UniProtKB/Swiss-Prot annotation:
GO biological process: fatty acid biosynthetic process; holo-[acyl-carrier-protein] biosynthetic process
Catalytic activity: apo-[ACP] + CoA = holo-[ACP] + adenosine 3',5'-bisphosphate + H(+)
Tagged with keyword Lyase: no
Gene: PPT2
Keywords: Fatty acid biosynthesis, Fatty acid metabolism, Lipid biosynthesis, Lipid metabolism, Mitochondrion, Transferase
Top-level enzyme category: transferase
Compartments reported by the entry: Mitochondrion
E.C. code: 2.7.8.7
GO molecular function: holo-[acyl-carrier-protein] synthase activity; magnesium ion binding
Function, in words: Transfers the 4'-phosphopantetheine moiety from coenzyme A to a Ser of mitochondrial acyl-carrier-protein.
UniProt name for this protein: Mitochondrial holo-[acyl-carrier-protein] synthase
Domain of life of the native organism: Eukaryota
Gene Ontology CC: mitochondrion
Pfam family, one: ACPS
Length: 173
């Protein structure tokens, strides 16, 4: 069964779109090079604000694989940023902004980017969010059914200097 066939008829609870300028992320990685101890320290502070620990671990592995700044690194970090931005927009379609934690908590603690074995990007809810962030347990209680009955369908595309991310928050199959 094709992807489209499996997903026809699923209710969409929210949609988000974000576009980023890749040279902006290339500049950040050049200015705060992960291959320089001083730069690495500053880059870690920056990435902790929007990358989940699982994404930072994956980024560390990419740094080892690449061993220098490459478009793959720029695209990874920009893709994570763009997915977080558009996931917030999708969540705001069905969750009151007043009920959501600050963007930094949502980005670095609640959601993380993964991919399937075939390389298709995915955005996952961290099931440990309520335990890691007790201050926001009420969010988990109020919206637990949303997080257990819905998932993000995501798409990333890049061409030259731009990367675009789209998220649809949909009912699970």
């Amino acid at each position: 069964m094709s992807f489209a066939s499996r997903n026809i008829g699923r209710k969409i609870a929210g949609v988000g779109v974000d576009i980023v300028y890749l040279p902006r992320f290339a500049h950040i990685l050049e200015k705060y090079s992960p291959f320089d101890p001083c730069g690495r320290s500053t880059l870690n502070k920056i990435t902790r604000k929007f990358m989940h620990e699982k994404e930072r671990f994956h980024f560390s592995n990419l740094l080892i694989e690449e061993n220098c700044l490459t478009p793959r690194l720029h695209e990874y970090i920009a893709g994570v940023w763009a997915l977080k931005e558009c996931s917030l927009k999708a969540l705001c379609c069905c969750v009151s902004k007043h009920d959501l934690p600050p963007a930094q908590v949502l980005y670095a603690g609640m959601l993380y980017k993964t991919q399937t074995d075939t390389g298709v990007p995915q955005l996952e809810f961290d099931k440990m969010f309520g335990k890691k962030y007790p201050k926001y347990q009420q969010l988990s209680k109020n919206y637990d059914s949303l997080f257990s009955t819905h998932e993000f369908l995501v798409s990333l595309s890049h061409d030259k200097d731009y990367l675009i991310a789209v998220t649809n928050l949909v009912e699970r199959e």
